[in-house]
Each structure stands twice: as structure tokens, then as C-alpha cells.
Amino acid sequence: MHLIRSLWVVAAGLLVAGAAQAQTTGLDLAKNKACMACHQVDAKRVGPPLASVAERYAGQGPAMVDYLAGKIRGGGRGAWGAVPMPAQTHVSPEDARLLAEWILSLAPPK
């Protein structure tokens, strides 16, 4: 019984470490791709806070990753006010998906 409990503790620790690593990697990628020039995680800049984007779209299913990745690469207008988001064609489709997954991970647990 003690062994099973120990394994659960180790597994939980690995999950927490993995989530923290994803947060760091996502933020690093967002900085590297210049997302942070217009966005912040928790405060409005030119664009909406990424945490607000996460709250709006979280829990809407796995297709939301593709939707947000498309918005990152293709840009958009009208969803967050008058300022349009320019297309970020320098972001690869793979990096756009990673960014979208990271952004969605910023939503508070429900």
C-alpha cells in the first residue's frame, strides 16, 4: 500500500513539473515570436491579455486549438475590439499550435 501511495505522489509531481515546463516553454515561444510586443499574460497592452483569450475559448473542445492557431497565423479583426491582429506568417503552423495550446492552458480551472 505504501508503494502505491509513493507512486501516486511521484506521478502527481511529474504532472505538476510537466505543466510548469509547458508554461515556461509557451511563454518563451511567445516572447521569441514577438507575441508579447502586443500581448501580456494578465494585462491589456495593444491586444487582449492572453489569460482573457484563454478564458473565452477554454473548454470548447480540441478544435479550439486549430481555431486559435489559425487566428495566430491568419490574423483577425473584431473579436477583441477595433484593433485588428495582423497575420503572423512568420510563425510556423506547428509553433502556432503550440502557442494556442499554451494560451488555452492559461485558463483558470473550472
Which sequence ranges carry the predicted segments?
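Sec-exported extracytoplasmic/periplasmic mature domains
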Residues: K31, E55-A58, P62, R73-R77, ...
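The canonical Cys-X-X-Cys-His
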Residues: K33-V41, L99
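Solvent-exposed loop/turn segments at secondary-structure junctions
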Residues: A43-R45, H90, L106
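Axial heme c-ligation environment in periplasmic c-type cytochrome domains
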Residues: P48-Y57, R73-L98
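Electrostatic cytochrome c docking/interface patches
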Residues: G18-A30, R56-A58
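Bacterial N-terminal signal peptides
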Residues: W8-A17
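Bacterial N-terminal signal peptides that target proteins for export
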Residues: M1-V9
